[in-house]
């Protein structure tokens, strides 16, 4: 929108789309994509981390290159912050760093189950990592839902 406005006002500005982002909500279903997450990928060049909540209505996938730098994320059934993943992808964070800080990406953490705790445990089990899984905040302990 901003680029279009500049160009309509005769101030030529190049279009720089930035990191791909898409978010959709249909009734109570949340779905978000950050960065590049194709439906298929070359397993020799791309590492995949996938976590699914046991009832099957919430999941998280992160793709990384062979250096374990984040390429993109899909999440289904819970909300995460766009700004967090925009920064992580732009700055080429490692998958470990993304997962270690995943509590910072949690949207409305006081009111939703802290899925990031289970995601962090699953990532450590699959890829290892030198981080401690986050803990619930005082507000989450007091009012929040559980996983």
What are the language-model segments listed below?
Residues 79-96:
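A short, polar/charged loop-to-alpha-helix boundary motif
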């Amino acid at each position: 929108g901003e680029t279009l406005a500049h160009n309509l006002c005769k101030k030529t500005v190049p279009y720089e789309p930035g990191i791909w982002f898409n978010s959709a909500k249909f009734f109570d279903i949340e779905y978000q994509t950050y960065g590049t997450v194709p439906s298929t990928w070359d397993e020799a060049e791309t590492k995949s981390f996938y976590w699914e909540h046991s009832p099957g209505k919430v999941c998280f996938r992160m793709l990384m290159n062979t250096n374990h730098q984040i390429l993109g994320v899909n999440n289904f059934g819970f909300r995460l912050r766009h700004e967090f993943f925009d920064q992580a992808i732009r700055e080429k964070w490692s998958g470990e760093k993304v997962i270690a800080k995943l509590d910072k990406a949690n949207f409305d953490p006081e009111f939703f189950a802290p899925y990031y705790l289970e995601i962090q445990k699953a990532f450590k089990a699959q890829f290892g990592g030198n981080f401690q899984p986050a803990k619930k905040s005082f507000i989450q302990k007091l009012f929040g839902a559980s996983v």
